[in-house]
Amino acid sequence: MMAITVKYVAVGKWKTNAYLVEINGESIIIDPGDEFDLLDKTFQSNQYTYKCILNTHGHFDHVGAVEAFKNKYKIPFYLHGKEKSILRQSNIMRKFAGIDGFIQIPEIDFHLEEFDSIKIGGKQINILHTPGHTPGSVTFKIDKMLFSGDLFFRDQLGHTDLP
């Protein structure tokens, strides 16, 4: 039987859910938000090997810690190619949102639209293109779990009116 463990931390102004998913000795980070130090400390009990960072979309509140994780752990970053312009606008959008400081804009290592799934720890992670919140939004399906970013909010659909 495959062991899957999910840890999450709500980070940043809008309490973005950042996830560490551990599957049979390998880990992925999903939507690491923008508080690298908090996440790195929280996830330090992780005894598994980080394999990659997967992002559901490119808004700044989901990608702020990506570059720090890439640099520290030498792992690739996966994002849908339709998110490139959103990613490039991250610091402008932070300013409009009234959030001080800047994030380091990460380079996309792999475009999610090129994959139907990826395998981590011997388990298939299905990649579903779910545009609406952003043009390149995706949902990750692992067994009966969905990681959908801002596709849904509590008791409502996610915003579809954001750049």
Model-based region annotation:
Residues M1-T5, K74, T160-D161:
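Accessory terminal helices/loops
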Residues M2-N46, V138-G149:
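Conserved beta-strand hairpin/beta-sheet module of binuclear metal-dependent hydrolase folds
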Residues V9-V11, E107-D109, L128-P131:
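Short Gly/Pro-enriched turn/cap motifs at secondary-structure boundaries
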Residues W14-K15, I105, G121, T134:
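Short, basic and Ser/Thr-rich N-terminal targeting/leader segments
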Residues A18, L39, A65, R88-S90, ...:
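Short, function-defining helix-loop hinge/capping sites that tune catalysis or transport
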Residues V21, D31, H57, F69, ...:
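Divalent metal-coordination and catalytic microenvironments
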Residues S27, M93, S117, Q124-P163:
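Metallo-beta-lactamase
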Residues E35-K119:
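Active-site HxH/HxHxD metal-binding segment of metal-dependent hydrolases
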